[in-house]
């Protein structure tokens, strides 16, 4: 790459540098010319004259070293032009023999390593010798004295002629400032006048070097007069060309004067584009695009407008860009939607495990599609925690229905124009992302995945969620209007699938979508997903062969329990990938194994080179990061096992109560939220209202305080579903009857002792099963939710729906406190015990809901 001054800053300001005043006239050279031995700075594409101040950019190593040597001495340097600007490493033969002695006025090192230097030409120098010395060019030469063989009157006449011509040149050349003439008026010396004018005329570099080499002032002035006169002739020729073009234009076309001038120049060069051919091509594309009649009319009107414009005008570029976008819309192109339900079902099952509700909805749509010719695409919203496969499910749906897939991330979008586009009046306007993606995919009926639709926001530029109201309304999206296209676009055949982590979506927008909830995966589902999909995927991704590694189901189960705490499977996949990477390293360090030493399993199949199981899992993943809750081993007074759920699943939650001397206060600890505190107050009121029936002293609060504590105090907790657990704990403390350790419970309590419904039942039952609980008491109103509980959970747990707190106490305490009454529901299904044990702790900092 060519360096400047190694090159100059171009333009008039390079020679008139207002920040640095030009020094006064220097005294005449001495009678004996000085013999110079100075660093040499080779120049490319520039000739520096005496009395000229110019900034230069220096980037070559030798040139920068020459400047360093000059700055270390008296700041003088020889500026010599190269014969060829393409020479990167010039030697003596590559330089002219006449240069300029210059003084360095200012030097600045730039961030990119180059140097910007301001120099002033002092005098002409004949360079006799150039050698390389200390990494720089060093030159020996002699200052050249100007000669004047002509009469002073003749020289003065030539100088006046030159000044007159240059004034004419400056007036017709807009690139030169008028202030330059004022500077020249103050110069009396003819030689200096010539050296000041020479850099400002647009002649070849060779002519400027020739001016530098001429020592006779009169001869130099005469050559300069000829060069300036020639430049004036060129300017007059340009003016005649402009006049000829202008005379050929009609009055209505005068506003396109500059564009017509460019056309005339192109015509002279024979380089005019085939504009009529392009217009015919656009007309053909419009006819073949299959546009609706109103759209085709709009396109033809824009094309006619384009024909009347100059091809080089800015407006023509806007119209041409608009037609390109309009023609890019797939007006009639579509893919054939697959109607084979069996193939679609197999495709969905091959990519995702579980998610039966979503798959059922897609198959229903395909079944109806096979009977109805014109059917609007469904608008689904998949709501679930991160990592459960919402986005990848959208890809599988597109694959199953044979639609093209388009993903549009809505996270962080604040501008309505991202959806509807910008109007064409704005510079750089574009269609919205819907139209852009339709053009990109080239299909009228793709699957649009609107990812993270709950992450949109609004600002002064508009509300993008409001713009989506028309897009996601099946009754309106057949005439969607983009601000840029300004024509109706039919989106009714597009299948929209939105994803969201929560229902924090504006109500009108949520109402237009069919919400399908995707809950977190159970432990069994995670195990199946890992063994079927994640392990084979990571084995392949890390360059392993199936016979080189075997990850057992017990290892996957331990990863789920002790190394991840999530609703989805993203971290599970990361841990599997970590194991695969360590196995790859282990195999690489061990080196190739001899064929004779390869073990063979009992069934004759080759045994895996590395086997990962629960016993050696810590070798690959380190110490366990999490523990899961487990049932207490012994029945205790005042300690009851409740159930809670978080964003990453269910948890066992202990509730402890005790009596301490006091004045009847209720003490609550364990980072309880407002709802949970109110639930504790309600529980105490229930106990006091039933005190006599339960055999409790009605005045038990006269000299005692009741302290209720929920362990794991660093974790905030809130919710009403620990109400019956608090009642049971208080009754146990007051009656001294232990609570069964194998019973867990969840339910809200009312002042009348009724057990109300709760949420998160599935997650809570999974936590109970995992923690070794045998019996779970749930509100009777949640009986309907048992249909969504996995079969293995309902089979291995004894789930008892209850309506009143009396039933809870009869089942949870070691011995009943109240006689059994007919009419109370006592449904107790027998079930085998489970042997799943662990430790009860929540993830630190996780807010627990009850």
Curated annotation (Swiss-Prot):
InterPro entries: AAA+_ATPase, ATPase_AAA_core, Lon_bac, Lon_bac/euk-typ, Lon_lid, Lon_proteolytic, Lon_Prtase, Lon_prtase_N. One of its GO terms (molecular function) is sequence-specific DNA binding. GO terms for biological process: cellular response to heat; protein quality control for misfolded or incompletely synthesized proteins. It is found in: Cytoplasm. Coiled coil: none annotated. It catalyses: Hydrolysis of proteins in presence of ATP. Residues 819-850 are annotated as: Disordered. One of its GO terms (cellular component) is cytoplasm. Residues 821-840 have a biased composition (Basic residues). The active site is at residues 721, 764. Induction: By heat shock. It is an enzyme of class 3 (hydrolase). Pfam families: AAA, Lon_C, Lon_lid, LON_substr_bdg. Homohexamer. Organized in a ring with a central cavity. This is Lon protease. The gene is lon.
């Amino acid at each position: 790459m060519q360096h400047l001054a190694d090159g100059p800053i171009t333009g008039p300001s390079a020679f008139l540098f207002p920040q640095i005043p030009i020094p006064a006239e220097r005294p005449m050279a001495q009678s004996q010319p000085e013999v110079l031995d100075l660093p040499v700075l080779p120049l490319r594409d520039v000739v520096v004259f005496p009395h000229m101040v110019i900034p230069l950019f220096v980037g070559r190593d030798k040139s920068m070293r020459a400047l360093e040597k000059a700055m270390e001495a008296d700041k003088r340097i020889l500026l010599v032009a190269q014969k060829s600007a393409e020479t990167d490493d010039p030697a003596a033969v590559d330089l002219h023999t006449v240069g300029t002695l210059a003084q360095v006025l200012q030097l600045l090192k730039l961030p990119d390593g180059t140097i910007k230097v301001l120099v002033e030409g002092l005098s002409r120098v004949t360079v006799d010798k150039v050698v390389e010395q200390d990494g720089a060019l060093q030159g020996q030469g002699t200052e050249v004295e100007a000669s004047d063989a002509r009469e002073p009157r003749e020289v003065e006449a030539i100088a006046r002629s030159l000044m007159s011509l240059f004034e004419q040149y400056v007036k017709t050349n807009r690139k030169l400032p008028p202030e330059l003439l004022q500077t020249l008026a103050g110069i009396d010396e003819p030689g200096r006048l010539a050296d000041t004018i020479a850099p400002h005329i647009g002649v070849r570099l060779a002519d400027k070097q020739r001016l530098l080499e001429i020592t006779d002032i009169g001869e130099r002035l005469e050559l300069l007069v000829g060069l300036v006169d020639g430049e004036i002739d060129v300017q007059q020729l340009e003016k005649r060309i402009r006049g000829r073009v202008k005379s050929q234009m009609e009055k209505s076309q005068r506003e396109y004067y500059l564009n017509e001038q460019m056309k005339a120049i192109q015509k002279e060069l024979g380089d005019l584009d085939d504009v009529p051919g392009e217009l015919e091509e656009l007309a053909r594309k419009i006819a073949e695009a299959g546009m609706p009649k109103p759209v085709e009319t709009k396109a033809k009107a824009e094309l006619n407008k384009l024909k009347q414009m100059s091809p080089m005008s800015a407006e023509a570029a806007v119209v041409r860009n608009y037609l390109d976008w309009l023609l890019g819309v797939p007006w009639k192109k579509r893919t054939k939607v697959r109607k084979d339900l069996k193939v679609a079902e197999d495709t969905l099952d091959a990519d995702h495990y579980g998610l039966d509700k979503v798959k059922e909805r897609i198959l229903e749509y395909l079944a109806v599609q096979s009977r109805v010719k014109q059917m609007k695409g469904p608008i689904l919203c998949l709501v679930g925690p991160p990592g459960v496969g919402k986005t990848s499910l959208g890809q599988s749906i597109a694959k199953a229905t044979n639609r093209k897939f388009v993903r549009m991330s809505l996270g962080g979008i604040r501008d309505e124009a991202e959806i509807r586009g910008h109007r064409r009046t704005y510079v750089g306007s574009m269609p919205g992302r819907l139209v852009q993606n339709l053009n990109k995919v080239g299909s009228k009926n793709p699957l649009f995945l609107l990812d993270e639709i709950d992450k949109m926001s609004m600002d002064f530029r508009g509300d993008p969620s409001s713009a989506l109201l028309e897009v996601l309304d099946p009754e309106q999206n057949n005439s969607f209007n983009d601000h840029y296209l300004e024509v109706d676009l039919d989106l009714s055949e597009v299948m929209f699938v939105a994803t969201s982590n929560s229902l924090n979506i504006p109500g009108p927008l949520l109402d237009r979508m069919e919400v399908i909830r995707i809950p977190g995966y159970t432990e069994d589902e995670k195990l199946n997903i890992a063994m079927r999909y994640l392990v084979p995927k990571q084995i392949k991704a890390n360059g392993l062969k199936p016979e080189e590694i075997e990850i057992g189901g017990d290892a996957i189960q331990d990863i789920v329990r002790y190394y991840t705490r999530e609703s989805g499977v993203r971290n599970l996949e990361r841990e599997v990938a970590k194991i695969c990477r360590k196995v790859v390293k282990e195999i690489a360090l061990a080196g190739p194994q001899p064929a004779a030493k390869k073990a063979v399993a009992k069934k004759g199949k080759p045994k895996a080179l590395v086997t990962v199981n629960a016993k050696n899992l810590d070798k690959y993943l380190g110490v366990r990061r999490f523990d899961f809750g487990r049932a207490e081993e012994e029945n205790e007074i005042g300690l009851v096992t409740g159930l809670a759920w978080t964003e990453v699943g269910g948890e066992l939650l202990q509730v402890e109560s005790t009596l301490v001397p006091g004045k009847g206060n209720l003490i609550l600890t364990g980072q309880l939220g407002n709802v949970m505190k109110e639930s504790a107050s309600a529980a105490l009121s229930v106990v006091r209202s039933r005190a006599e029936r339960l055999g409790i002293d009605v005045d038990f609060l006269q000299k005692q305080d009741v302290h209720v504590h929920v362990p794991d105090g660093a974790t905030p907790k809130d919710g009403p579903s620990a109400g019956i657990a608090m009642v049971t704990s208080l009754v146990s403390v007051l009656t001294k009857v232990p609570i069964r350790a194998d019973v867990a419970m969840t339910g809200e309590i009312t002042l009348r002792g009724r057990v109300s419904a709760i949420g998160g039942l599935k997650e809570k039952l999974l936590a109970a099963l995992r923690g070794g609980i045998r019996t779970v008491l749930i509100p009777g109103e949640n009986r309907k939710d048992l249909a969504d509980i996995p079969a293995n959970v309902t089979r291995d747990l004894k789930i008892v729906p209850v309506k009143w707190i009396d039933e809870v106490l009869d089942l949870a305490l070691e011995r009943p406190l109240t006689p059994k009454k007919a009419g109370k529901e006592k449904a107790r299904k027998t079930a085998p015990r489970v042997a799943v044990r662990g430790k009860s702790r929540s993830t630190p900092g996780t807010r627990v809901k009850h």
